[in-house]
């Protein structure tokens, strides 16, 4: 369903993919461009229309505009769109998350339509947000699309399983080496390998930015390459460009927190980025972890405080 777009506007078998620009924009994080293109094109058949709508609504989710998705996807929509709606419901309604996961568990216990790539991706996204990476990986393992493999690589790298991520990347390269998703996954793996591979990762992010547009996803990728190479000043320039595009983007703010520490900036600078992150994303895993560490520190400090 939501398979990877190639580097040129041709799908498997060499036929033109009329949704290439929509998919490509979505994959590199140019969500508004994906929305604009999805609203402009007239799909040639109902299947393509559904696929276009999947990318349209996933782009709205990426912009945190959950209301648009919940208002527009009705109960009689296709299974693919129902899956997108399920993810929007999960993200928009914290009090209902446990119930949504329980319902998803029941669906996964029955026979799942593995041809519905969108369902697998949305289910895996819910499990991963719910801190259950094993369930996310099990779900994705049932799919064969480039997007399922790319998401598996992201999760495996977060679990420090570079060995398994490299195996998945090899599968992606065998399926379509030039696909946008394969190129992105190559950059993520190179970033994890480090050393001289960091420059290769940087060039992939840079080439995509030059060819398409310099998105927050690509800029943060470039900044991560610079930081891993100890090029802190170069990283600052790229992150500043990202911050100018969106002053509340969580990954940019987290990278600025790390960067300001390494550049020896005053503590208030780091605290400013943390405050911005708390304001815009109070439930972000980084903030929750940071606050847990603060509480641990306060508790330890109390233990060692001099008694009056």
Swiss-Prot record:
InterPro entries: Coatomer_esu, TPR-like_helical_dom_sf. GO terms for cellular component: COPI vesicle coat; Golgi membrane. The keyword Cytoplasm applies. One of its GO terms (molecular function) is structural molecule activity. Keywords: Cytoplasm, Cytoplasmic vesicle, ER-Golgi transport, Golgi apparatus, Membrane, Protein transport, Transport. The keyword Membrane applies. It is a peripheral membrane protein. Oligomeric complex that consists of at least the alpha, beta, beta', gamma, delta, epsilon and zeta subunits. Belongs to the COPE family. This is Coatomer subunit epsilon. It comes from Gallus gallus. The gene is COPE.
């Amino acid at each position: 369903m939501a398979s990877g777009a190639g580097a040129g506007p041709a799908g498997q078998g060499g036929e033109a993919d009329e949704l290439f620009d929509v998919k490509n924009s979505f994959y590199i994080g140019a969500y508004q461009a994906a929305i604009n293109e999805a609203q402009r094109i007239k799909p040639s058949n109902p299947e393509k229309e559904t696929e276009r709508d999947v990318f349209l609504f996933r782009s709205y989710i990426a912009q945190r505009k959950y209301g648009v998705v919940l208002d527009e996807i009705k109960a009689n929509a296709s299974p693919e769109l129902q899956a997108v709606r399920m993810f929007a419901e999960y993200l928009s309604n914290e009090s209902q998350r446990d119930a949504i996961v329980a319902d998803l568990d029941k669906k996964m216990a029955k026979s799942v339509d593995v041809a519905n790539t969108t369902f697998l991706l949305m289910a895996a996204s819910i499990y991963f947000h719910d801190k259950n990476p094993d369930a996310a990986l099990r779900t994705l393992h049932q799919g064969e699309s480039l997007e399922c493999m790319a998401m598996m690589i992201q999760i495996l790298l977060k679990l420090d399983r570079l060995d398994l991520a490299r195996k998945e990347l090899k599968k992606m390269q065998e399926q379509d080496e030039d696909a946008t998703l394969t190129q992105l996954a190559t950059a993520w793996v190179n970033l994890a390998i480090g050393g001289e591979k960091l420059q290769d990762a940087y060039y992939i992010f840079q080439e995509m930015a030059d060819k398409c547009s310099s998105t927050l996803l690509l800029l943060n990728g470039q900044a991560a390459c610079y930081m891993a190479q100890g090029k802190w000043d170069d990283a600052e320039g790229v992150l500043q460009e990202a911050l100018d595009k969106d002053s509340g983007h969580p990954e940019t703010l987290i990278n600025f927190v790390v960067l300001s520490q390494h550049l020896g900036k005053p503590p208030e600078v780091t605290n400013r980025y943390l405050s911005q992150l708390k304001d815009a994303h109070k439930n972000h895993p980084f903030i929750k972890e940071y606050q847990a560490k603060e509480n641990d520190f306060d508790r330890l400090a109390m233990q060692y405080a001099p008694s009056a």
